[in-house]
């Protein structure tokens, strides 16, 4: 099968990479990464995979399946267009918007499947298959790879716990402008090493501000890395606000504290005053109610820790093609066509 991994944003890299790994393991597949150069100036896998920044080259590849962890894919590309999502943040309005770009939605777990199947009955132009989320395959394989590094970090800094601060980048939702003093208080009062890992789209002034802050405290470390997953595996507790990484951390069965989360349903400890941070961390670690809530999230949001998520995705794509053939393009209204062309440009079609 000819596969395009459609990488518009940097955060998509480690969502898509497990598909490359499984496609290679299977054999008989050709994989091409489309990398959107306007948003990804330096592609970390440039020496390891076949990739292009050219939409024309992507079209000429004649893909049979396109995997997309974003909201849009050019309608004029051939291939079954598959939405695989960029996280679990169901409270964000755009998570449930059907933009008509996709032939299939491969959902993470029962909670998402139920809602997208309801939407499929309304729109009648896409299918829904529950597969799990591809990054979980990487986690299943590497869950304990960083245990020794974690122990060495704690030993080096002389601390008992690792706390990960992973805020969202959205200026309207982020805790970055108001939480700084209480992160300092946490580092002074608790026996913790604080790792700070920001979203790639975070404003540069906030990045610079917190890098400078970390330089002032021995047990505060600013992490420069495109992937947060490694640090989630090493951390004991997460602090956030309204980020899809909250759910990823809960799926590891680990406690989360948020400041002013906008979620309608809260499965963790949410505070509305940053001064409550230190006490909240103590509470969320020990409280049985939060443990039960995490178990519910695991069962409903993504129970697939078997390491076979991508296998199900590839089989799902092949099954669609067996039944319906390879779509030549996606039928869209003029506005969606215009948006596609404005974002990714035009191509010369083969005659």
Region locations from a protein language model:
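Active-site and donor-binding regions of nucleotide-sugar-utilizing enzymes
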Residues: 4-143, 147
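Conserved catalytic-core segment of nucleotide-activated headgroup transferases in glycan assembly
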Residues: 12-27, 135-210, 305, 309-311
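Catalytic donor nucleotide-activated moiety binding site of glycosyltransferases and closely related
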Residues: 32-46, 187-222
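Short beta-strand scaffold positions
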Residues: 35, 68, 107, 240-241, ...
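Donor nucleotide-activated moiety binding/catalytic core segment of transferases
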Residues: 52-57, 202-247
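A donor-sugar binding/catalytic signature common to diverse glycosyltransferases
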Residues: 72, 77-85, 225-268
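Catalytic binding pocket for nucleotide-activated donors in carbohydrate/polymer assembly enzymes
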Residues: 123-124, 130, 244-305
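C-terminal amphipathic helix plus adjacent low-complexity
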Residues: 286-351
